[in-house]
Amino acid sequence: EADTLELFAAQAAAHDSDGVVIMRVLPFTYARDPFRIGGQYRRENLELAEYRAGQIQEACAAVAAPGQTCVATVVDIQIRADAQDPANVAQLGADVDGFYILGGDQTIAMRVIANTPAEAALAAGFAAGAAVGGNSAGAAVLSRYMIGGYTGDNFAWHGLHQGALDLWYGPDDSDQRGLAFGLQEAVVDQHVLERGRTARLIQAMVEKPGDKLAV
């Protein structure tokens, strides 16, 4: 994973124009409920996210050019109200060189972020050249056509069965999709070898809406 973080950090560093590589770490995949969260659970999530931000900052320091400073900070977006909070959205502005989305639950994540000012800010940053990366669920949301998981009691060994997958490719005004600015010609899956997901990735291609590449 260190190599992955360094690759992300290198892309963020390449976007930097003032000697300070600004990266925002986003835990909107962490919640169990997209609309409410307890104070203790929020604090525990923030502690974990801060740890991950430290790893990302270290990865950046390893690849930054001489004279560049790396700053990775967590933006506390965990539920939908957070994604609509102007104070949080302001931290996703034009000065950001990279956005990193943490792992968790991609279906919760899209219910938190879809069609919010925060998603619009991420899209604007991406369009301006900022790096956007993620791991686990944070990688899953990076494709517009998203694998949400399995349906019902289906699991990895049902991956080739039609209807076994929870596939998200609703219209832009829904939350049944990956990020609106995500990869349009590919679908991203994760933990493919560790969790036996090759079959479900193949099935996602069979059921795909239009031509897609599996990543």
Language model features with spans:
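Short, solvent-exposed amphipathic alpha-helical segments in soluble enzyme
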Residues: L7, I202-E207
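A generic structural signal for alpha->beta connector loops
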Residues: T69-V71, G129, K212
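Extended, subdomain-level signal for the structured scaffold at the beginning of enzyme domains
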Residues: E1-T107
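Class I SAM-dependent methyltransferase SAM-binding "motif I" and its flanking Rossmann-like core
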Residues: M110-T198
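General beta-strand structural signal in soluble alpha/beta enzymes
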Residues: Y100-I101, V132-N135, A214-V215
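Short, intrinsically disordered, charge-balanced linker/junction segments flanking boundaries
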Residues: E207-V215
